[in-house]
From Swiss-Prot:
Transmembrane segments: 28-51, 75-102, 111-135, 173-204, 224-246, 288-308, 320-340, 348-364
Cofactor(s), names only, from the UniProt record: heme b
Protein name, entry field: Cytochrome b
GO biological process: aerobic respiration; cellular respiration; mitochondrial electron transport, ubiquinol to cytochrome c
Length: 385
């Protein structure tokens, strides 16, 4: 027996990335998982090295980031890799989730796999927000103020929760210090959840574009899919390097190069681009409490998909109606992101409300109705044969 199979530790590696049987029909959309693993490693490694030079004291936080940029050897590469790496992390994560939605990866028997993925998504959003606050520029300070103030919408105990989060009466030194501590901790929790994600994947294996069982035609992970993954890894590294070295601030906000000042409110307070769709959903509801509930529901609604999709066929590969409404949903999500970056004024308020309705309607109305209609059409087509 090969040593990689007999050794208790290497046998785990072997069963996941060497001899793991994969459906022969999977396409490049299945490469997003390996890219997400690469992104997580980049973020953790660059974050650890940056933490060696960063100070979480509110008087020193902004200056310590500039110290990393100016004085630390290759510090600017660390900072720009970390900042742009976060944006690319979310780009790939959105594509990974879109693949799951399109190909029905949330369907039984992979419901646990999907649910763990949603938890990873929530933890990643929290980590990104905490890290954005650690820079303590203008947008960091006011972003922290706005988002933490959302908890004040909770009846009776909301204001106490906000004061507890702040560690005082406003965003101050205790806030940034505890945010940094959590920002350092949560990525390791994400790494643990990724291991759980892989364990859940290993039970039933990967799905495939055809939506049928792949047990009849599987090939080993190595060397076929390892080299296939390397194609997108090198392409990803090339595009990331172009941003890091030639356009490092394109995905950021210029106001965050101004030290945080609680006495000066920016013209517009917007989060990073990857949180804009959920920010638009929050702002589309006039009532504060309902807005907060709706924003969190926009993420948690992903958990109901395994139950609202009633189709007898997994995925949208052979379903024309489902394809059409899926791309409507994608367009609507991009539109929400654009609206989230706009001021709260006519016509963006009404557009945001319509887009929010379409977002929830897709999961709760469109998917169950269309899947039922397609089931009837499949049945009619089979009977007529």
């Amino acid at each position: 027996m090969a040593f990689r199979k007999s050794n208790v530790y290497l046998s785990l590696v072997n069963s996941y990335i060497i001899d793991s049987p994969q459906p022969s029909s999977i396409n490049y959309w299945w490469n997003m998982g390996s890219l997400l693993g690469l992104c997580l490693v980049i973020q953790i490694v660059t974050g650890i090295f940056m933490a060696m030079h960063y100070s979480s004291n509110i008087e020193l936080a902004f200056s310590s980031v500039e110290h990393i940029m100016r004085d630390v050897h290759n510090g600017y590469i660390l900072r720009y890799l970390h900042a742009n790496g976060a944006s690319f992390f979310f780009m790939v994560m959105f594509m990974h989730m879109a693949k799951g939605l399109y190909y029905g990866s949330y369907r039984s028997p992979r419901v646990t796999l999907w649910n763990v993925g949603v938890i990873i998504f929530i933890l990643t959003i929290a980590t990104a927000f905490l890290g954005y606050c650690c820079v303590y520029g203008q947008m960091s300070h006011w972003g922290a103020t706005v988002i933490t103030n959302l908890f004040s919408a909770i009846p009776f105990v909301g204001n106490d929760i906000v004061s507890w989060l702040w560690g005082g009466f406003s965003v101050s030194n205790p806030t940034i210090q505890r945010f940094f501590a959590l920002h350092y901790l949560v990525p390791f929790i994400i790494a643990a959840m990724v291991i759980m994600h892989l364990m859940a994947l290993h039970i039933h294996g990967s799905s495939n574009p055809l939506g049928i069982t792949g047990n009849l035609d599987r090939i080993p992970m190595h060397s076929y899919f390892i080299f296939k993954d390397l194609v997108t890894v090198f392409l990803f590294m090339l595009i990331l390097a172009l941003f890091v070295f030639y356009s490092p601030n394109t995905l950021g906000h210029p106001d965050n190069y101004i030290p945080g000042n609680p006495l000066v409110t920016p013209a517009s307070i917007v989060p990073e681009w990857y949180l804009l769709p959920f920010y638009a959903i929050l702002r589309s509801i006039p009532d504060k409490l309902l807005g907060v509930i709706t924003m969190f529901a926009a993420i948690l609604v992903l958990l109901v998909l395994p139950f609202t999709d009633r189709s007898v066929v997994r995925g949208n590969t052979f379903k024309v109606l489902s394809k059409f409404f899926f791309f409507i949903f994608v367009f609507n999500f991009v539109l929400l992101g654009q609206i989230g970056a706009c001021h709260v004024e006519v016509p963006y308020v009404l557009m945001g409300q319509i887009a929010t309705f379409i977002y929830f309607a897709y999961f709760l109305i469109i998917v169950p109705v269309i899947s039922t209609i397609e089931n009837v059409l499949f049945y009619i087509g089979r009977v007529n044969k």
